[in-house]
């Protein structure tokens, strides 16, 4: 009786349900993610301890605007008086939007790029991880004690280091047990660092944002110790249930899925696919589908032209029909075959792809959802 006259959207209704559930359960920490934009989003009713804004890209433009500054202004709407804010990778006019909003709200703002001057972030393959583990084991056996980290010359930022290489070894073992690649995070003041389970290239930027946010939370009184950093970064998928972020589902051939669904997301995916093709000498087989309301042409222009494509559609009404997508892709110089379902497309890719090569599945969160829902059918474990 209360909700029906308001005609809430699905997201608005489930947000209200989540808030009620969190209150009833008296959760220690609630992480609330904006649905779209920020200023007018239903989640913006709360006053949090910390606001985090990730990188700004072109998405939902029919609602948020057709320039990055307009989109940034909508996202800046979550910045509140005296609530610190962390902002991910941004530049130029977009950075000024957030700086001016933070000044108007009398709050402290941190841009994660400020960490780059004293932080080294690197993608590590599975073999690289084995080498890092061997080096750490040598440190441990020689009982080298690492220096205590000094306060860094940056407001509210005291970077986190491990005290004992054993923590890093345990973190690497957790990742290697899952046959995964990783992101390593090192600071110039210490010899060993953090190992991040999410290994997509975009995570090299995201992990800086996470570190900045965690450091501010520590300053606000949250109890976060060094061991928590190692456990959290190396075990994030199991602890959160997060799926579809450059997630490996099979070896021989490698099969990776990713939920990137716009041009901004595919810029990182393109770099990773280029590395796989040119450096690892693996031929690419790409299962691809999108929803109709995205800027499909911009994404198609970013896809490698020397790959074999399996065009398909997800099991949602918004999905672009596979034959229409294949026609658009053909005009962009991409060659392949269309399949009515994700299962059909992935099955064809697995049959055609030699063990030494590589299968990528993506283009839409719904494509990845269909894939993950059919892991047993496709024998992906």
Feature-to-residue mapping (PLM):
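Glycine/aspartate-rich loop-and-adjacent alpha/beta segment that forms the canonical ThDP
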Residues: 364-381
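Glycine-rich beta-strand-to-loop/alpha-helix junction loops that act as flexible
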Residues: 36, 288-290, 362-365
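Conserved catalytic-core segment of NTP-binding enzymes
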Residues: 38-40, 47-105
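ATP-dependent carboxylate-amine ligase catalytic core
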Residues: 1-46, 62-64, 70, 92-93
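Glycine-rich phosphate-binding loop signature in dinucleotide/nucleotide-binding domains
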Residues: 22-28, 276-281, 349-357
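Nucleotide phosphate-binding/pyrophosphate-handling subdomain across enzymes
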Residues: 29-32, 42-44, 48-52, 56-60, ...
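Beta-strand->loop->alpha-helix junctions that form or flank phosphate-binding loops
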Residues: 88-89, 103-135, 139, 166, ...
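C-terminal helical cap/extension that packs against the catalytic core
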Residues: 91-97, 101, 109, 166, ...
